[in-house]
From Swiss-Prot:
It comes from the Bacteria. Its main location: membrane. Disulfide bonds: none annotated. The keyword Translocase applies. Part of the ABC transporter complex UgpBAEC involved in sn-glycerol-3-phosphate (G3P) import. Responsible for energy coupling to the transport system. Residues 4-236 form the ABC transporter domain. The complex is composed of two ATP-binding proteins (UgpC), two transmembrane proteins (UgpA and UgpE) and a solute-binding protein (UgpB). Keywords: ATP-binding, Cell inner membrane, Cell membrane, Membrane, Nucleotide-binding, Sugar transport, Translocase, Transport. This is sn-glycerol-3-phosphate import ATP-binding protein UgpC. It is found in: Cell inner membrane. It catalyses: sn-glycerol 3-phosphate(out) + ATP + H2O = sn-glycerol 3-phosphate(in) + ADP + phosphate + H(+). GO terms for biological process: carbohydrate transport; glycerophosphodiester transmembrane transport.
Length: 370
């Protein structure tokens, strides 16, 4: 095992106007599980492929342990990769697929089989070792792909959207499987996904990527509770945070949301007076009236009933919002719903920079740079 260091990584494809990746720096500790998450086209898979040696690096340094690996071939980097499409050899059995990389390294058959059997037991693949990939389900194929990576005993695991081809139930099962494996193996892991649920449930830390730039690095609860930018606030969460174009009033005590709607700021702050802001409210913080906080009126457009929770979609202060309510609340489309908002649940972002404004530093209107 080893730490993974990325320093000022940059990438531009020939003929492209802008870089795909710009000044990416991150330190991944020995044994840490880090998830890179972002929308399609943000550069996350390109970054993973650069770590693997499948893409060249324009600028910057990639180190695995203390070794600079920029110029090393993939086979010499001591990494193992799990792909979205499994990448299994169709003519080989499960056992042969899992042991093939060890065979190429020249290991003896006895040692290869020992490793394969050991990993097969961990992944509950013992009964499938003589089957071909076509005889396996999607979840079984992905477990074989993971097993093939594990038998190599690499310094770093790389996962490229490994659950994307699975249905929702299997994705949930495989998330638990990956969690369990990481607790057991404690191998340094870099995992790429567009799915924020995977990021929040699997990661020790999350790297949120957008348009080739890092928006925020932090633990899942930090990313969710204190998003560094309006982009992170909207992207992380299901549904994402409601964002309003807003402005502080001239006293710095209230937030003007539009259509005559206003809310008290968490703390009076004259330095914010008249300032244009983005205001954020998580769907679960639009509570049913009577649960504390200022009461606002939401016009209901539609309702999604999801069992324990109901999602109410509608208009508030002239802007589209979603509120997450308990199962018993079922407002009719076209009706008015009274919701309550506590001041401390507000998130504030600068309208121009989109950076977070911390409540604790609001007296100086400081921008968070974490």
């Amino acid at each position: 095992m080893a730490k993974l260091s990325l320093k000022n990584i940059a990438k531009r494809y020939p003929g492209a106007e802008r870089r795909v990746l710009e000044e990416i720096s991150a330190e991944i500790a020995d044994g840490e599980f880090v998830v890179i998450v972002g929308p399609s086209g943000c550069g996350k898979s390109t970054l993973l492929r650069m770590v693997a040696g499948l893409e060249s690096t324009e600028d910057g340094e990639i180190r695995i342990g203390e070794r600079l690996v920029n110029q090393l071939e993939p086979k010499d980097r001591d990494i193992a990769m799990v792909f979205q499409n499994y990448a299994l050899y169709p003519h080989m059995t499960v056992a042969e697929n899992m042991g093939y990389a060890l065979k190429l390294k020249g290991l003896k058959k006895v040692e290869i089989m020992e490793r394969v059997l050991k990993v097969a037991a961990v992944l509950e693949l013992e009964q499938l070792l003589q089957r071909k990939p076509r005889e396996l389900s999607g979840g079984q194929r992905q477990r074989v792909a993971m097993g093939r990576a594990i038998v190599r005993e690499p310094a770093v695991f790389l996962f490229d959207e490994p659950l994307s081809n699975l249905d929702a139930k299997l994705r949930g099962q495989m998330r638990l499987e990956i969690q369990r494996l990481h607790r057991r193996l404690a191998t340094t892991s870099l995992y790429v996904t567009h799915d924020q649920v995977e990021a929040m449930t699997l990661a020790d830390r999350v790297i949120v990527l957008n348009k080739g730039h890092i928006e925020q690095i932090g633990a899942p609860d930090e990313i969710y509770d204190r998003p560094a930018t309006a982009f992170v606030a909207a992207f992380m969460g299901s549904p994402g945070m409601n964002l309003f174009d807003a402005q502080a009033d001239e006293s710095g005590e209230r937030l003007l949301l539009g259509d005559g709607v206003s809310l008290a700021l968490p703390a009076a702050n004259p330095a914010l007076a008249g300032r244009r802001l983005k205001a954020g409210i998580r769907p679960e913080h639009l509570r049913a009236a009577g649960e504390g906080g200022e009461t606002l009126s939401l016009r209901v457009d539609s309702l999604e009933m999801l069992g324990a929770d109901n999602y109410v979609y509608g208009l508030l202060a002239g802007q589209n919002v979603v509120a997450r309510l308990a199962h018993g609340h079922r407002p009719e489309p076209g009706s008015r719903l009274e919701v309550a908002v506590r001041a401390e649940s507000l998130h504030l972002f600068d309208a121009e920079t989109q950076r977070r404004i911390e409540h604790a530093a609001a007296s100086q209107a400081s921008l968070a740079v974490s």
